Amino acid sequence: MDVILEQLETHTQNKPNDIALHIDDETITYSQLNARITSAVESLQKYSLNPVVAINMKSPVQSIICYLALHRLHKVPMMMEGKWQSTIHRQLIEKYGIKDVIGDTCLMQNIDSPMFIDSTQLQHYPNLLHIGFTSGTTGLPKAYYRDEDSWLASFEVNEMLMLKNENAIAAPGPLSHSLTLYALLFALSSGRTFIGQTTFHPERLLNQCRKISSYKVAMFLVPTMIKSLLLVYNNEHTIQSFFSSGDKLYSSIFKKIKNQANDINLIEFFGTSETSFISYNLNQQAPVESVGVLFPNVELKTTNHDHNGIGTICVKSNMMFSGYVSEQCINNDEWFVTNDNGYVKEQYLYLTGRQHDMLIIGGQNIYPAHVERLLTQSSSIDEAIIIGIPNERFGQIGVLLYSGDVTLTHKNVKQFLNKKVKRYEIPSMIHHVEKMYYTASGKIAREKMMSMYLRGEL
């Protein structure tokens, strides 16, 4: 992480009293951050650390300091999610052979597991930032390598979308989440203030943004966080832009943003932990069902097309990750095959859904995300997912689970979707839910919702 550390050192020298971190009620200047990193380096130097050191801490401030201190010691941080169940922690430590784990109270060393990631293996991945994990929504989280060059390339294109002289970046999610860690390093490398929270609390976050009068804030959030913020937002705050990632932002939320804060820029990113950014949509200028236009440094193709021309999305860019741990290294010249299906039309990317969410109804492939986006254009529906349940005649049938203040009939839904989708894409059943349940990364937990529905718990 040579470049980012050099940039951080430059900011420490040129503006030592500027705020680097504003976490909850604590503010830390660039000078103070440098001193605390130096102190952490001195403490960690007492130990014989292995090449990879896991960080599993609840405190964002301590996590940031440890992350940067490990880089000064030429170690590779592995970012673990503190909210994972202890069994998941144990499984990951055993699977990847992690010997050193920094927790909230101590450094645990010589964990009884065979060394898996060693210095020889890391030589194939120069200039690593960290080892991160996928969200693990369909199984055990999967470890991957992220290098510095890829995020420096992301910072460059991201800067093009900072259109309002934003001098602070807020990201209230856990640092183990790629979006939050990205926002932190983007802020520190560019000399801005990073605003974060131990636990997301919308009203307190807005108060943090208001506390320093000079803040012009860009917020990096998932859609569910934006929805929560709008419930307590007023025009006193200094938010200049929302950068939304992790899921498609419902058009109803965009309308609320423009009704409550017409001057705020809304930039939707589509990408993954592995690919970083793929496309963007500024102020919903793209067609409603699209996830925007490709970033200029992204190449995209689709393969394995069905009869509708929908295929598997493959991406190539200099923002790509370096590969999964224990698998082959990936370079910028290789195509990465995502788990997403979609198509490109007139320069806009359309995402039809994740491969494992696809339903097969009467022999027809159904992509729920496409229908869900249409449904959320209805003023009667806040959020919607379509799940598949077994059916003797058709193999599966689609069931719409939706939230909103209005109770709909199947006839209402059918009339709304008529002429918008094919007949077999219309859900066979509908069910109103009081609320949706979400994953740790803020996405609707499809598997949990389906399990609860099948058990009669919704």
UniProtKB/Swiss-Prot annotation:
<protein>
    <recommendedName>
        <fullName>Putative long chain fatty acid-CoA ligase VraA</fullName>
        <ecNumber>6.2.1.-</ecNumber>
    </recommendedName>
</protein>
<dbReference type="InterPro" id="IPR025110">
    <property type="entry name" value="AMP-bd_C"/>
</dbReference>
<dbReference type="InterPro" id="IPR045851">
    <property type="entry name" value="AMP-bd_C_sf"/>
</dbReference>
<dbReference type="InterPro" id="IPR042099">
    <property type="entry name" value="ANL_N_sf"/>
</dbReference>
<keyword id="KW-0276">Fatty acid metabolism</keyword>
<dbReference type="GO" id="GO:0006631">
    <property type="term" value="P:fatty acid metabolic process"/>
</dbReference>
<dbReference type="InterPro" id="IPR000873">
    <property type="entry name" value="AMP-dep_synth/lig_dom"/>
</dbReference>
<dbReference type="InterPro" id="IPR020845">
    <property type="entry name" value="AMP-binding_CS"/>
</dbReference>
<keyword id="KW-0443">Lipid metabolism</keyword>
<keyword id="KW-0436">Ligase</keyword>
<comment type="similarity">
    <text>Belongs to the ATP-dependent AMP-binding enzyme family.</text>
</comment>
<dbReference type="GO" id="GO:0031956">
    <property type="term" value="F:medium-chain fatty acid-CoA ligase activity"/>
</dbReference>
<dbReference type="Pfam" id="PF00501">
    <property type="entry name" value="AMP-binding"/>
</dbReference>
<dbReference type="Pfam" id="PF13193">
    <property type="entry name" value="AMP-binding_C"/>
</dbReference>
